[in-house]
Regions:
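Noncatalytic, helix-rich "gating/capping" subdomain that lines the substrate-entry/channel surface
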Residues: 1-228, 232
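Intrinsically disordered, low-complexity linker/terminal regions across diverse proteins
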Residues: 79, 108-112, 126, 130-137, ...
Length: 525
């Protein structure tokens, strides 16, 4: 339960060989702070329906005075939300890393007993806590005192019910879907029970499922091909960094050092998780999940103060995704992403470089985006840029923010260019470097024309195919408000309109919808 404080553990950003424990803002039942503070009609309607939903869950849980308590809970959450840091500001670790000795935590929150809190977590011997949202904690201290005890009790009961609603009674599960599925996301029908069951097993015993998935669906030749692609993309990034005309030699040297220290995990872990001590009962869903959570908590406690396990994978191999870790300076590509539309063993190189090549380039690019660029090649949070180079980088990224701010799927809602900046830098770098890697792989040979499309055209087509998607209005609004990725159509079109080769490949001219004047096109990496 992470209300109203979330505690998590990952590499210490100033000493990434060892784990650090982080505390940050939390405790909202709606997806994000703006749901509580915006005054437009849609936000007000959602808040009204949310209050009714809280009352419904409390009533189903047989908690007295459900309607009154629901109002108190939503009011308390609104006070917490008003003190939450903006999601855009959470990206800057140089401002949000605040390591405080546990003995000094009460100077920030004198009305909160940190010693008892940490003891309940099993972390009573922890020497320091890294506060990510310090101003929130200062404000929370006052909210704790100003809010009556009965409201806190009701809020914590609600938070526990909300966190476990999908595994409680059928009526609570149905009510949970009605709000979070139908109202917030526009989903018309809940998934069948068997699919929800698969998801539960997947989340709880991910590497058990992953081991079976890899054996059935991940041939060795796919991993070999992926390793080649990663090596080629890193080589292309090196060429690009060496050729940048806006970067000084001092910063360039540091960037190349960081690139050379990248590590890649491909497919699946070398050592699978051992779940043999986890007790599982065929007729005790809640108990199974509770025991699994307790086992995971004990696993985290055993790591306190220890060295980071670099062999660990954050998400199992059957998940279609990839990620970059700044403090580990590693890129991770799971087995499940090595399938169409991202990758096809029988497709030609152009399509694969445009699709998976751009994904690889995207993840490498996160090491050099607005957030990842603040970490060096050893994963240490430090400034390795000259002031003039950082200023030039931020001028270029500001123009990218302006471009994405202009994308407006609805009259009353635009993409948040500041919030999505890191992903947009990744997308632009991904297709740019994917294209360069394909050109380098040709090694001067002329690419064949296939089905009337040149090699360069097929790179762009492979990239665009990755982003085919359809959204319900509610889901699109939810994504724009909470997700650091732009909607798919803008990920495809927003990146390519900055790439000169796109104009030549498809004869894009001034009257075309995706045309950008050369002076407005952004090149970063």
């Amino acid at each position: 339960l992470d209300a109203p404080i979330a505690v998590t553990q990952f590499a210490d950003l100033l000493n990434p060989e060892y784990y650090g424990v982080y505390a940050l803002q939390s405790g909202l039942g709606l997806p994000e702070r703006e749901y509580y503070i915006k005054n437009d009609d849609k936000s007000a309607e959602i808040r009204h329906k949310y209050r009714d939903h809280v009352a419904k869950i409390l009533e189903l849980a047989r908690i007295p005075d459900a309607a009154q308590r629901a109002g108190d809970i939503v009011e308390l959450e609104a006070r917490l939300a008003a003190r939450h840091m903006r999601k855009e500001d959470l990206r800057d670790w140089s401002q949000n890393y605040n390591k405080v000795a546990t003995a000094d935590l009460n100077e920030i929150m004198p009305n909160f007993d940190w010693a008892v809190f940490l003891d309940e977590l099993g972390a009573d011997e922890l020497g320091a806590l890294i506060l990510v949202t310090t101003d929130y904690f200062r404000a929370l201290d006052g909210i704790i005192v100003d809010t009556d005890l009965d409201t806190w009790k009701a809020y914590l009961k609600w938070s526990a019910l909300n966190a476990t609603a999908t595994r409680l009674s059928a009526d609570i599960d149905a009510a949970n879907f009605e709000f979070y599925g139908r109202v917030l996301a526009g989903t018309e029908a809940q998934r069948p029970l068997w699919r929800r069951g698969v998801n539960v097993v997947n989340r709880t015993l991910g590497e058990v499922v992953g081991r079976v998935y890899v054996a059935r669906h991940f041939p060795p030749e796919a991993k070999d091909r992926m390793e080649d692609l990663v090596a080629n993309l890193i080589s292309a990034y090196e060429v690009s960094i060496r050729d940048l005309d806006w970067m000084s030699e001092d910063t360039r040297s540091q960037a190349l050092d960081k690139l050379a220290k990248f590590t890649a995990k491909i497919g699946y872990p070398d050592q699978w998780r051992d779940y043999s001590l986890l007790e599982i009962s065929g007729d005790d869903l809640y108990g199974n999940l509770e025991r699994a959570a307790a086992a995971e908590h004990e696993r985290e406690l055993a790591r306190l103060g220890g060295k980071v396990d670099r062999a660990e994978w954050g998400i199992p191999p059957q998940t279609v995704n990839a990620y970059y870790s700044p403090p580990l300076n590693e890129i991770v590509f799971r087995a499940a992403i090595l399938q169409p539309p991202f990758f096809n063993l029988v497709a030609d190189d152009a399509v694969n470089y445009g699709a998976l090549g751009a994904v690889i380039g995207h993840e490498i690019g996160h090491g050099f985006d607005d957030s990842g660029s603040r970490f060096d090649g050893d994963g240490v949070l430090r400034n390795w840029w000259t002031d003039s180079d950082r200023e030039e980088f931020e001028k270029r990224t500001a123009r990218l923010v302006e471009q994405y701010d202009a994308f407006r799927p609805f009259d009353d809602l635009a993409v948040n260019g500041e919030f999505t900046l890191g992903e947009n830098i990744g997308d632009l770098g991904g297709i740019t470097i994917g294209l360069l890697a394909y050109t380098l792989a040709l090694d001067g040979r002329e690419a064949p024309v296939i089905d009337g499309f040149t090699g360069i055209q097929r790179v762009f087509l492979g990239y665009a195919q990755v982003w085919r998607n359809k959204y319900r209005e509610e889901a699109l609004r939810l994504l724009i408000g909470t997700n650091p990725h732009a909607p798919s159509m803008y990920r495809a079109n927003g990146a390519v309109r900055n790439v000169p080769e796109f104009y030549a490949a498809f004869d894009v001219v001034e009257d075309d919808a995706l045309y950008l004047p050369p002076a407005e096109r952004v090149k970063i990496w």
